[in-house]
Amino acid sequence: MKNKFLIIDTSILPDVFDKVVKVKELLRTGHVKDISEGVKQVGISRSTYYKYRDSVFTLSESVAGHKITLGLTLAHKAGTLSKILDNIAQKKGNILTINQDIPINNAANVSITFDASQLEVEVNELMEDIRTLKSVIKVNLAAVE
């Protein structure tokens, strides 16, 4: 059976999945010395950890070497797209394609696809950085390939 992957907001999932990810992060960063210490710290059993550890990943874990497509709505202001592209490039995202509609009612829809294999931050953090830029109306994760 072929695996099927979904991107799901953790707020709708049982806490156990978030706790498995937390244990993996504690192990990766060296904040705990072994799995027993990690599961004890977050409050799950070892069997729960082993059951889900190979199936639950953060978005940043799952996109290494993958393409990300962001859908954006931008105000029609000079330099807005350039600032977004600079932001992605500064975090080592490699732009692959840009599609931009003509502005209607002073707003344009843009999709940007980039290689995330060298991305230095999590995709969520990159999206938040872009959201804070002036003239950015909306940012959403359109696709992960």
UniProtKB/Swiss-Prot annotation:
Domain of life: Bacteria
Signal peptide range: none
Domain ACT: 69-144
InterPro entries named among the record's database cross-references: ACT-like_dom_sf, ACT_dom, UPF0735_ACT_dom-cont
Family, similarity comment: Belongs to the UPF0735 family.
HAMAP family reported for this sequence: UPF0735 (MF_00707)
Annotated protein name in UniProt: UPF0735 ACT domain-containing protein CKL_0858
Species the sequence originates in: Clostridium kluyveri (strain ATCC 8527 / DSM 555 / NBRC 12016 / NCIMB 10680 / K1)
